Amino acid sequence: MMPIPANPTNASIQPQSLYDAWADLAWRAMLTEVNLSPKPGLVDRLNCGAHKDMALADFHRSAEAIRHWLPRFMEYGASCTRLPPESVLAGLRPLGMACEAAMFRATAGVNTHKGSIFSLGLLCAAIGRLYQLRQPITAETLCATAADFCRGLTTRELRQNNLQLTAGQRLYQQLGLTGARGEAEAGYPLVIRHALPHYRALLAQGRDPELALLDTLLLLMSLNGDTNVASRGGADGLRWLQQQAAVLLHQGGIRTPDDLVYLHRFDQQCIERNLSPGGSADLLIVTWFLAQISQVNH
């Protein structure tokens, strides 16, 4: 695991070295998620899940491409502290689009991390803003700042009636799902109230970190109105996946390596049903990133 630079005094800290350290954490979060195995329906070290157009190497190349853009989100967040927070998102969009273009170049057109560019871009901009304002940088303050950036986002982008609906607008109108936009605008409640406390508690109990992350993924899958799942399997597919994850948790979750057999079975069922909980995977990346944020001494 890549060490995080420690700085002896605040006076010696240069913002760029801190930005690079936080960017490395976000990069490691993406790698930690994709390498985690076995994951139901998702690309991992064992198989490509319910995907026929992407593989593990695509995610590694994508994460490396995105990594170099993350400090720019922080720099932008630091540069616009005089703007009201709800005005920040407009300036982040060009950065996000450029980062997406770098991802697509690295993967020859495969969408591996578009959701993570959105969430990590928001959180990195929040880091820059809070650092510049000399405010505490914690999981809670980062998610609250991201929520401020996204104020009114779901109303603007999901509730409007276009002649040609986007996938997100269609799922919102049909099923009431707000997806990544709604989670961000609400301050990532699935992470702050559920996944992050759950993951921290398991680690405090001495649970193996990989098993703890797999258990946390199940928790997210059981709670998340995942638009990736709904776009593939509709309301029935989403309901089935949530129920299967909840049943595994009720039976004790992923406590020991012996429990991985249940995840292998769940993975095969997701592949057969063509279901991939990519939204929950994105939230797991956010969870791991926020769990490690205190490693960077600032």
Swiss-Prot record:
UniProt keyword ATP-binding, yes or no: yes
PANTHER family: 2-(5''-TRIPHOSPHORIBOSYL)-3'-DEPHOSPHOCOENZYME-A SYNTHASE, TRIPHOSPHORIBOSYL-DEPHOSPHO-COA SYNTHASE
Domain of life: Bacteria
Gene source species: Salmonella choleraesuis (strain SC-B67)
Catalytic activity: 3'-dephospho-CoA + ATP = 2'-(5''-triphospho-alpha-D-ribosyl)-3'-dephospho-CoA + adenine
Protein's name in the database: Probable 2-(5''-triphosphoribosyl)-3'-dephosphocoenzyme-A synthase 2
Gene: citG2
GO MF annotations in UniProt: ATP binding; triphosphoribosyl-dephospho-CoA synthase activity
Listed InterPro entries: CitG, TriPribosyl-deP-CoA_syn_CitG
Any Gene Ontology biological process: prosthetic group biosynthetic process
Annotated family: Belongs to the CitG/MdcB family.
EC number(s) stated in the UniProt entry for this protein: 2.4.2.52
Record HAMAP family: CitG
Key word Transcription regulation present: no
Keywords recorded for this protein, A-Z: ATP-binding, Nucleotide-binding, Transferase
Group of enzyme by EC: transferase
